[in-house]
């Protein structure tokens, strides 16, 4: 029987577009080696993700996929079953591919939440949280924060008013958090209310428009900025916030923690403190060389 992968090796991968700068293969393949796990993690760069593509992966022996831009919302629609975050927010960044069914998970929110708790837990207590953007990552992050019990108010600022309103409706309906869509112009007038800014759009990413999305006078030393873009780590938005004295959560931290959860979903093995430390060091070194 012809297959594209070695059946003695458990094969996983990442699907999205573009993927030339993805660090996910480094993360997963390194931890497989550290743990002596007979597995490999491949790159599947494609602009199209559909039922036929999932079946191709299944036929090729692919057991799990990390899903990134622009496929997170599509990934949810292709799954037969889904975790609560995926089901409620209608976006997934992880697919487990079984013989007869596909299961969707969203680890973005958990990754972001862990990052915030580690680097700036106070930012969840002192003011309102605003999420910039309304794509797949924003959905997972919004839900995880809403059900954490740590916040009471959430603002979503996006150029796409329809998806921003949808996220807010879903959050308000499924949690005790009051979520409110807000335009950029209005956000600028309410900056004193904000303690945490989470940027989830591609602006500032290598090869994308630089941004910065918000002006320097929006930020102050009482704010924290979490820009989930990690290539480069110092995006124009990060530099703008730094000049104003804002605290910065590195975007690579979300990549780290969401990948650790994916590793657990793929292999059934819980990552330990050493896995996290080693992966953080590898990411830091890789990003320094970019």
From Swiss-Prot:
Involved in the biosynthesis of the chorismate, which leads to the biosynthesis of aromatic amino acids. Catalyzes the reversible NADPH linked reduction of 3-dehydroshikimate (DHSA) to yield shikimate (SA). The keyword Oxidoreductase applies. GO terms for molecular function: NADP binding; shikimate 3-dehydrogenase (NADP+) activity. It comes from the Bacteria. This is Shikimate dehydrogenase (NADP(+)). It catalyses: shikimate + NADP(+) = 3-dehydroshikimate + NADPH + H(+). NADP(+) binds at residues 84, 133-137, 228, 251. Disulfide bonds: none annotated. The lineage of its organism: Bacteria, Pseudomonadati, Spirochaetota, Spirochaetia, Leptospirales. The active site is at 72 (proton acceptor). Pfam families: SDH_C, Shikimate_dh_N. The keyword NADP applies. Homodimer. Keywords: Amino-acid biosynthesis, Aromatic amino acid biosynthesis, NADP, Oxidoreductase. Gene3D superfamilies: Leucine Dehydrogenase, chain A, domain 1, NAD(P)-binding Rossmann-like Domain. CDD domains: NAD_bind_Shikimate_DH. NCBIfam families: aroE (TIGR00507). Pathway: Metabolic intermediate biosynthesis; chorismate biosynthesis; chorismate from D-erythrose 4-phosphate and phosphoenolpyruvate: step 4/7.
């Amino acid at each position: 029987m012809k297959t594209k992968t070695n059946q003695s090796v458990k094969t996983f991968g990442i699907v999205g577009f573009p993927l030339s700068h993805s660090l996910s293969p480094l993360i997963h393949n390194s931890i497989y080696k550290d743990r002596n796990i007979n597995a490999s993690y491949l790159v599947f760069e494609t602009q199209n993700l559909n039922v036929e593509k999932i079946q191709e992966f299944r036929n090729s022996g692919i057991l799990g996929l990390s899903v990134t831009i622009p496929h997170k919302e599509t990934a949810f629609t292709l799954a037969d079953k889904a975790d609560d975050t995926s089901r409620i927010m209608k976006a997934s960044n992880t697919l487990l591919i079984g013989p007869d069914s596909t299961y969707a998970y969203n680890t973005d929110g958990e990754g972001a939440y862990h990052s915030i708790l580690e680097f700036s837990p106070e930012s969840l207590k002192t003011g309102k949280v605003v999420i910039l953007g309304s794509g797949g990552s924003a959905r997972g992050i919004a839900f995880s924060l809403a059900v954490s019990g740590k916040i009471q108010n959430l603002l979503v600022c996006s150029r796409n008013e329809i998806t921003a309103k949808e996220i807010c409706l879903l959050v308000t309906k499924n949690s005790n958090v009051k979520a409110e869509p807000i335009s950029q112009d209005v956000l600028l007038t309410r900056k004193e209310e904000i303690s945490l800014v989470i940027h989830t759009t591609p602006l500032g990413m290598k090869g994308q428009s630089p941004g910065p999305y918000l002006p320097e006078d929006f930020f102050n030393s009482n704010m924290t900025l979490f820009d989930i873009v990690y290539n480069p780590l110092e995006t124009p938005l990060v530099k703008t916030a730094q000049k104003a004295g804002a605290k910065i959560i590195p975007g690579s931290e979300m990549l780290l923690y969401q990948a650790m959860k994916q590793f657990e979903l793929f292999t059934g093995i819980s990552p330990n403190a050493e896995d996290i430390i080693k992966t953080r060091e590898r990411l830091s070194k890789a990003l320094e060389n970019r």
